[in-house]
């Protein structure tokens, strides 16, 4: 059963990378993250958590998910607003794949549930946001991810140091773009890198 979850509202400070994009480098040895673009939702001394932005979830779409979670009845799926019918459902990462996370624009907020991140992007992981989207009263922009990418204390820093990831400021237009197949190349180009010339020796943007 897929479920939503509560969020820890503690945000990191200082030289952490919350609100930035992680772009996998060509030497990424973990096939789960090869050519992935990840939005980093939280980063602190205790570890990091992010959502993969360019991999679609298999075997389920948003209307089906709403029915499964009993947000709507099966007969109501045909009456959803267009924004709900077409909303992306992503494979957000390999951790807790039965949990749902909604990345969205900051025009929507639920007390004690929504975590503002950076640059007009927030994260909500309770079923209330799904109800709002189903009614057409949700955020202007949103994507739903099942699962997330997680790192233990110091793990992400070590991977970046060993050129596993490129990090750069996030762009909401890229986060919420539904052209998943070209998102990796476009993320690289946004930091001035031609994907055809990128090598495993490249540094940070």
UniProtKB/Swiss-Prot annotation:
It comes from the Bacteria. Pfam families: DUF179. GO terms for cellular component: cytosol. Belongs to the UPF0301 (AlgH) family. This is UPF0301 protein Bind_0718. It comes from Beijerinckia indica subsp. indica (strain ATCC 9039 / DSM 1715 / NCIMB 8712). The lineage of its organism: Bacteria, Pseudomonadati, Pseudomonadota, Alphaproteobacteria, Hyphomicrobiales.
């Amino acid at each position: 059963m897929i479920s939503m979850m509560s969020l820890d509202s503690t945000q990191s400070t200082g030289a952490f990378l919350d609100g930035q994009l992680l772009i996998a480098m060509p030497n990424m040895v973990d096939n789960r993250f090869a050519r992935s673009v990840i939005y980093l939702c939280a980063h602190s001394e205790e570890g990091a958590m992010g959502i993969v932005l360019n991999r679609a979830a298999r075997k389920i779409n948003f209307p089906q998910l709403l029915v499964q979670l009993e947000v709507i009845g099966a007969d109501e799926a045909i009456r959803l607003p267009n924004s709900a019918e077409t909303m992306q459902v992503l494979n957000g990462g390999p951790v807790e794949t039965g949990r749902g996370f909604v990345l969205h624009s900051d025009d929507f907020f639920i007390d004690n549930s929504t975590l503002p991140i950076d640059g007009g992007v927030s994260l909500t992981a309770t079923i209330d946001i799904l109800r709002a989207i189903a009614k057409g009263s949700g955020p202007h922009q949103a994507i739903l991810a099942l699962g997330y990418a997680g790192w233990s204390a110091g793990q992400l820093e070590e991977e970046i140091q060993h050129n596993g990831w490129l990090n750069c400021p996030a762009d909401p237009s890229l986060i919420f773009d539904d052209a998943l197949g070209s998102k990796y190349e476009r993320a690289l180009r946004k930091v001035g890198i031609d994907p055809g010339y990128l090598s495993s020796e490249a540094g940070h943007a």
